[in-house]
């Protein structure tokens, strides 16, 4: 399964320490093996799933959009939008998705 990392995701990972980067990599691997593991969001975030994992007694969230299962599509792509702690997580995610929609791009 192909992984597509969006800018907020990459910015957080770039600033993270090595042990946290490894934990994020493990979480991404879990999501890729079972894309339906995260909680489905509704409203402004419809179509987005959020997977939660713990690292050093802190809960982190990974926002992603699972692939659409179609028989004609051989290559499945998961879009990873954002990773971080709960503080301002959903506000940043909504802002990013709205910004992409305002520019005429499909997020």
Regions found by a protein language model. Name each.
Residues 11, 30, 85-88:
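Active-site micro-motifs of SAM-dependent methyltransferase domains
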């Amino acid at each position: 399964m192909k992984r597509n990392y969006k800018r907020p995701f990459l910015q957080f990972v770039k600033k993270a320490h090595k042990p946290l980067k490894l934990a994020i990599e493990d979480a991404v691997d879990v999501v890729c093996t079972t894309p339906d593991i995260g909680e489905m969001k509704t409203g402004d975030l419809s179509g987005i799933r959020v997977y939660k994992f713990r690292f050093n007694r802190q809960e982190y969230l990974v926002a992603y959009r699972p692939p659409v299962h179609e028989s004609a599509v051989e290559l499945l792509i998961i879009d990873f939008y954002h990773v971080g702690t709960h503080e301002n997580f959903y506000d940043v995610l909504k802002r990013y998705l709205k910004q992409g929609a305002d520019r005429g791009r499909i997020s």
